[in-house]
Amino acid sequence: MACAKEAARHGARVVLFDYVKPSTQGTKWGLGGTCVNVGCVPKKLMHRAAVIGQTLHDAHHFGWNVAEEDMKFDWNQLVTNTRNHIRMLNFGYKKGLKSASVTYINGLASFPEHNDGHTLQYVKRFKEKEPPVPLTFDKVLIAVGGRPAIPSNVPGAVEHAITSDDIFYLNQSPGRTLVVGAGYIALECGGFLNECGFDVTVAVRSILLRGFDRDCTNKIYEDMVRWWCGGGAGVVGVVGVLLFVCVDMGKLVNW
């Protein structure tokens, strides 16, 4: 969007295509890309919810007497408010593109098989069964971002697993959760779920946060063992390609 608006500011006629292919669980969202819809924004809102929960538990140290039985976490309320905030941002981005004289098309663009280098075709959302519409251009910028992948060679993963594309839109709480992987997105999601009161197990192939400073990641690991395991969560590590994780009252997961 930044490139589209900048090009329009310099006098170019600009069309911006945005299309979200639903996740394996059917999750889809509006204009704004990963950060706004399934990344930074919802993650920070849910992290904030987790921090507030911890603050309530510690409030009595600062003179606030909040009874434990009165502290009830409502997942549906959090998800509803998160969605509403994201929709507000989606609307704001649409207005911003219009103000910048950028034509926004909610559709899937592609290059035809026999391409002259200056033609693409697109199908608008909700009109996928209609013939593609051709569009000529002088220059094209491809900036589609990335999506999380579910390994298709793991039986049941595609049908039952969710990703960060889904966690912020779940209509019911995730309950006991196995987080497979130990990158920063995995630990962020596992962290706010744990602090919101859910039992979380993180399955680690080798080390946490590969590529990050080891002193910092070792400290994070120590804190996870200290705080997560005390609340019913766990950290399971393995060196190799096959992992067996047995979660109490849950299922045996082969990885």
Question: Where do the language-model regions lie?
Answer:
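Glycine-rich flavin
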Residues: 5-12, 16-173, 206-210, 214-227, ...
